[in-house]
Design a protein with these regions (language model features):
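A detector for small-residue-rich transmembrane helices and their helix-helix packing motifs
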Residues: 1-241
């Protein structure tokens, strides 16, 4: 099930969401110009390494470019391949604009990065000794998905459902699209191995839950605005994270 777009207009331009997408693309394009060794060094310098963050290990001096805490944020803009980047940016493009519209620019910035921190720490906690860099925006985007599920459970989302050589386009409620995504993260987290890298499913789950909690707080803070927008809009219808 691949979401393509939602039927949920906004009243403002999501400049923060566009900025995040643009910056992630620029960083990835810069990565493409690196040699294999340079890319490895770049990933270890700016990716989030659980054992380094927790003070268990230290990076060599030539790789220690910023503080371990700083890598929580730099890692959110790095991606391990085209599919990793495109998948993350697609979800951000579809779902982030409405949450940014609800929260406003500054609150959305806070929301997005706190969701990313919650996601990162969820992965770190389950494997504090890991020396594998964690990169990707999926955890922070998971927070956006959690918020969207709360604010727009009935919004219609156009999805592509592959059936072997055939595919079907249908519109379904976001609660089913995002619920399916969340369940899939849980299932995959039990099926995957943490020994050699892969996908940081715990970060996805942690980001989603963080977003759920945060949006409830922000909804109280901006209750009047969110309530109006919900009524208006729902009428119509390495470790990679």
């Amino acid at each position: 099930m691949i979401p393509l777009k939602d039927d949920n207009p906004t009243s403002t331009k999501p400049i923060v969401s566009y900025g995040i997408i643009g910056f992630c693309v620029l960083i990835f394009l810069a990565q493409l110009g690196l040699t294999e060794q340079e890319l490895r060094d770049f990933t270890y310098s700016y990716g989030l390494i659980p054992s380094v963050l927790m003070g268990i290990d230290q990076l060599p001096n030539d790789l220690s470019k910023i503080s371990p805490i700083g890598t929580i944020f730099t890692s959110m803009f790095m991606h391990g391949g085209w599919m990793h980047l495109i998948g993350n940016m697609l979800y951000l493009w579809i779902f982030a604009d409405n949450i940014e519209d609800d929260l406003g620019t500054l609150n959305f910035v806070i929301f997005y990065f706190v969701s990313g921190v919650g996601a990162a720490m969820s992965q770190v906690i389950i494997d504090v000794n890991s020396q594998i860099p964690m990169i990707g925006a999926s955890g922070a985007i998971g927070g956006v998905l959690g918020a969207y599920l709360i604010n727009y459970p009935n919004a219609r989302v156009l999805v592509l459902i592959p059936f072997g050589f055939f595919s079907q386009l249908i519109k379904i409620r976001s609660i089913y699209v995002l619920g399916f995504w969340f369940i899939l993260q849980f299932v995959n987290s039990f099926l995957s191995s943490s020994s050699g890298g892969g996908v940081a499913y715990a970060a996805h789950i942690g980001g989603f839950i963080t977003g759920l909690v945060l949006i409830l707080f922000f909804n109280k803070k901006t209750k009047k605005k969110v309530f109006k927008s919900k009524i208006k809009k729902t009428k119509k219808g390495p470790w990679e994270q």
